[in-house]
Amino acid sequence: HYSSRRQRQMCIRDSLRAKFTGAPEQVMQLFKFIAEDVRSYLQIFNVDSLDDLIGHADLLGLKVMDNNLPKSLHKLLRNAVSDKKHPGFIRHDEGRLSRRLTSEIMKGLRSKQSTIIQYPVSNEDRSIGARVSGEVSINKLGEVLKDNPTHISLSGAAGQSFGAFIRDGINLKLIGSANDYVGKGMGGGSITIIPQGTKNKGAYHAAGNAILYGATGGQLYISGRVGQRFGVRNSGGIAVVEGCSAHAAEYMTGGTLIILGSVGFNFGAGMTGGKVIVLKTQKNFSQYISKSAPESREMNDIDLLELRAFLNKHIEQTGSELAKDILKKEKDWSKMFTVFGGIANVTESDIDTAKAKIEALD
């Protein structure tokens, strides 16, 4: 998600992709030829599969005898056949950290106690929060969790799907960075990500692609930028980030997104509901907006109310210097921000309803 790996740059940068001619079907044909070639060798050795060849060095030989070769190379021709067949893959660790967190949290819930946990995390730790959410549902402890919320503080680089499918009462805080699919399908709770050891105002990429994908609820605060497809299919989640890449808010139907930085191309494609408040930092801003996105509009009283509340929450959760600077310029917000979606013409009743919803989030 830092876009620094050569393989990733080739995949996402049009200027590099243009250097590769051909079609996907040609790659498929290449692998088909390789498979047919392997099959012909298997027939020569009169075996049914590659598994039958593994370890059979007796089928190998030296093509050219060279006296200058070290004698130790002849050891390569010793048979290494084992009674145990290798499965052909390596089993991935099934989430030791996730199981540990679940065990501690469930123990606290059965005693009707809140749990506060701190652990280091690595990118091998995937779907943190999903397992415990499932266990809470299976054991019908949802109401107990709401009354006794759990707070999980982690440090490091979290793996895929950090905070996926979490529910009300689960609060995740990460000092570091996270991979793709943060908050995927989350229905409640909160996720906070604070980059470790950086003072950059919004420039740091703190999380990967498809953040908040398909979320139905909950709150997400990231003190940094995120990758492509931020908020896709969001129907109820609330999030504040400090910039994002292409395809943000695609097919969004509900919820509220606040973007305190630049956006990528194709913003808002197919968006039919919800609201996105964007800080206008780019020249030719309109060029980044999809033709199928809702028309942008000026901020109204509800937008100002929500922006103020969520900026304060963002600062409270992350300590964001960027958000602090923006909060000082409240009188200029109408010029600084534009809004997609939401209610254009508001009444006093609408404002009262918005205030009640914001208060209910605390």
What does each model-found stretch correspond to?
Residues 49, 68-76:
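Short, solvent-exposed coil/turn linker segments
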Residues 1-8, 12:
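Single conserved hydrophobic/aromatic residue that forms the stacking wall/gate
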Residues 56-71:
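Short glycine/threonine-rich loop-to-helix capping motif typified by GTGT followed
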Residues 15-48, 54-57, 77-362:
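Long, distal/terminal scaffolding or interaction modules
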